[in-house]
């Protein structure tokens, strides 16, 4: 069996490689995906791949496994960066990590090497089960690190080629393995924040592509101007961080795109504005739910799932009814559906209702 392993230079993917070697697989080749364009990096951050590649080389040398660096920079810009920019322009909150997995790691990369390998291995925290050639995506044992949310837009064909060796391990166990076998990167810190940005700061990425434009911050209940901001594209519904005003905490409740206005409420009023019904579209089902029983949803990456019911409407629109209110439902983000620990797929949030 020929196996390709995606290495990031981090501990997780390195332990995933070690796990496959321990299982006796010998025909293995590793790949590092180079995605960011140099002209962007010169403006918005340090080169994110020099240190990565050094660790990839060290890990592959330790295990005597060949590796190759593949440039997917043009594909990444066209399939992920342009999507994020267009969503920000229209006031939506994009989820680029979902499309980085769907369109790059398991899209453009598949297009280049898929036919040559029987299995693609990564260090993602998730599980894939095969029941009589029926593939199921499930949450990882480590619910804090679980990445099924970001894998929700993969197709069954993509999933059938994937293997996630870390799905049954806790992060603490992975660190222990890294130290036990003395991985070169055993003490490397986990990456933080948005995967698709790496070391690049999100606000710097937005500023580079969309610039800044002064606008007013208005209290929703009174209409009073409380301050100014540098562009609606820097804000998302439910956001608290970055609103540098006194007498807070303040939360973003609405964005007026045409007039570049951000509306905010204090914590007391904000908590009264939670929503439990909203519409989604552009659905990707890995496996459709057979009923509404034990159905739950994630509105964002994290541990929390909220029980819900769904109703299929016209034009492939789905109405979602959460059992409890959520306070940061934002158009453009994704709602991911689960039945128990199975990830069924997800859809883009279109608008909130009540």
UniProtKB/Swiss-Prot annotation:
> What's the stated role of this polypeptide?
Catalyzes the 2-thiolation of uridine at the wobble position (U34) of tRNA, leading to the formation of s(2)U34.
- Which residue positions does UniProt flag as site: Interaction with tRNA? 124, 333
Which residue stretches belong to region Interaction with tRNA? 145-147
What is this enzyme's EC? 2.8.1.13
Source taxonomy: Bacteria, Pseudomonadati, Spirochaetota, Spirochaetia, Spirochaetales
Catalytically driven reaction(s)? S-sulfanyl-L-cysteinyl-[protein] + uridine(34) in tRNA + AH2 + ATP = 2-thiouridine(34) in tRNA + L-cysteinyl-[protein] + A + AMP + diphosphate + H(+)
Q: Name one GO molecular function term.
A: tRNA binding
Q: Where in the cell is it found?
A: Cytoplasm
Q: Which UniProt keywords apply?
A: ATP-binding, Cytoplasm, Disulfide bond, Nucleotide-binding, RNA-binding, Transferase, tRNA processing, tRNA-binding
Which cysteines bridge via disulfide bonds? Answer: 100-195
Enzyme class, broadest EC rank: transferase
Q: Which residues form the active site?
A: 100 (nucleophile), 195 (cysteine persulfide intermediate)
Protein name, entry field: tRNA-specific 2-thiouridylase MnmA
